[in-house]
Amino acid sequence: MRAPSASRLSVIGAILIAAALPAASALAQAPEGFFKGRQMTFLIGAGAGGGYDVYFRTFGRYLVRHIPGAPTIVPKNMPAASGLAAANTLYTSADRDGTTIGAFPNNIPMDTLFGNPGARYDARKLNWLGSIGKLENVCATWITSPIKTIAQAREREVIVAAAAATSNSAIMPKVLNALLGTKFKIVGGYDPGSGMTLALESGETEGVCGLSWSTMKAARPHWIKDNKLNVIVQLGLTKLPELPDVPSALDLVSDPVKKEVLELILIRQEIGRPVAAPPGVPAGRLEVLRRAFDDTMKDPEFLAEAAKLQLEIEPLDAHAIDTLLANAFASPKAIVAQAAGLIEPSAQK
């Protein structure tokens, strides 16, 4: 029998190579293998060093440990307009291959509904990975203030410190004034960290409304230990077990329409500290990211570091966020309009 000719061997080799290419290509594009050796970008819609930033940077370090291929991740702070810059960037111009994700303050998922004119995204079309935890906001006065209860805040003007006009510290006292009849006088423009702290401690202001309870415990634990604060009301869909004697704002609203407005606004608090990928990420890679998020939320090392930093972790998965948003966007137009008027006065409905 004659040996195959060189030309015939070349043809056979070409056929074998061609047959192998689809399998090799499929392997290279497998979602689990895509992230190997890649650098991810993590857009953080908050300033460096603040409460949101500490949460998100801690989370980001552990997230990549649960993504096959162990990619690296580079945080990029984009605090402008209370996180709108980060959300707009993620939605309009970020890579849609799964290598860019974003994390935001709690206003971002609802700003589309409330008609924020600066929002160039549809929150329902972002690919949510989950939320690190809800916001457990409270209103509190300093120990020297004569206002010790929410009832007293309905009788007498209370000067409260606030950051930007779009911050919780500015929005929540305005909401309570409208729906509960409180008399908070909002003094805005303070730095959300040290500025508001100094204003309270110096007596320049009497209190703050929309304060994150978990962030405050992490940043100012001595305030609790030394009983420096009078916590007068809770701002959430559910109450904090550790503050059993502090009433919930929802429990104080008797008018059913006002209650529905407040419930809609407080969905922002429930969503809390959300993380998302842009629209258009391939389904397999999105599943990898969502699985990595869920695994991070159960990672003992992550939870231990969070506890050390006094960061409370109460995660929501992607489905929970999608459900909250679907319910919010299904609200009656009249309720949305009233809520929007308190959250975003320039909204055009």
Where are these regions (language model features)?
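An extracytoplasmic/periplasmic, membrane-proximal ligand-sensing/linker region
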Residues: K36-R38, K225-K228, L252-S254, E260, ...
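Conserved hydrophobic/amphipathic secondary-structure segments
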Residues: Q29-G272, G341-Q348
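Bacterial N-terminal signal peptides
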Residues: S10-P22
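Structural beta->alpha junctions
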Residues: G47-A48, P278-A283
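Bacterial N-terminal signal peptides that target proteins for export
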Residues: M1-G13
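Sec/Tat signal peptide C-region and signal peptidase I cleavage site
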Residues: A24-A28
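A short beta-strand structural signal in non-transmembrane regions
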Residues: G272-P278
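Short, internal active-site loops enriched in acidic
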Residues: S10, P79-A81, Q310-E312
